[in-house]
Swiss-Prot record:
This is ATP synthase subunit a. It comes from Syntrophus aciditrophicus (strain SB). It comes from the Bacteria. PANTHER family: ATP SYNTHASE SUBUNIT A, CHLOROPLASTIC. Belongs to the ATPase A chain family. Signal peptide: none annotated.
Length: 217
């Protein structure tokens, strides 16, 4: 799918331009919502209250009350991924999350925050999480744990990229094969996949951060 001409830039990759576009859109929505807050909410305010309330409940249920401090980051990532995924369904637009670099940027932020939180909460004892339950397994467990942690950002990035980019390819092929019969149910499926992939990225991010705060056994 080709980028819209007004968003095309020969010096900046298209996924970066669309990421900026979505960030500007979310900031604008936030400012409009803040200025237009009412006791009796309108449709837009009600919709956003449901979305943000759902994110808040998800963070609390997954991470407990300690997770409240991470709500701004998790909610921001969730909104960005959701809007990015859905943007690709609009003719002429691209999903930034269909590019591996966009997803890797978010995954690296989660990776760095995870270990920063672990060190901040546990100090030097944080390394115990990499050593396993008994001392004689340390030579085996440390490489395994290091690899498992280093793979996390790669897993987050590739999972989201594969599902979103793969979905776009399937939709494009089906549009060519049966442009009048298949698109509508496939688009509903794409919306569902977009929601699921947003939740998966959020849940895994929260689980990684919550795991870093737990005591090593």
């Amino acid at each position: 799918m080709h980028s819209l001409s007004f968003l095309a830039n020969p010096y900046v990759p298209s996924h970066v331009v669309y990421a900026w576009f979505i960030m500007a859109l979310l900031i604008l929505c936030g400012l409009l919502l803040r200025r237009g807050m009412e006791i009796l909410p309108g449709s837009f305010q009600s919709f956003m209250e449901v979305v943000i309330g759902g994110f808040d409940s998800l963070v609390t249920d997954t991470m407990g009350h300690e997770g409240k401090k991470f709500f701004p980051l998790i909610a921001t990532i969730g909104l960005f991924i959701l809007v990015s995924n859905l943007l690709g369904l609009v003719p002429g637009f691209e999903s930034p999350t269909a590019n591996l670099n966009t997803n890797a940027a978010m995954a690296v932020v989660v990776f760095i925050l995870t270990h920063y939180v672990g060190i901040k909460v546990h100090g030097g004892k944080y390394i115990k999480q990499f050593m396993g339950p008994v001392w004689w397994l340390v030579p085996l467990m440390i490489p395994i744990e290091l690899i498992s942690h280093l793979v996390r950002p790669l897993s987050l990035s590739i999972r989201l990229f594969g599902n979103i980019e793969g979905g776009h390819i399937v939709v494009a092929v089906l549009f060519l094969l049966a442009p009048f019969l298949v698109p509508v149910p496939i688009l509903f499926l794409k919306v569902f996949i977009s929601l699921i992939q947003t939740l998966v990225f959020m849940l895994l991010s929260m689980m990684y951060i919550a795991g870093a705060m737990e005591e090593a056994h």
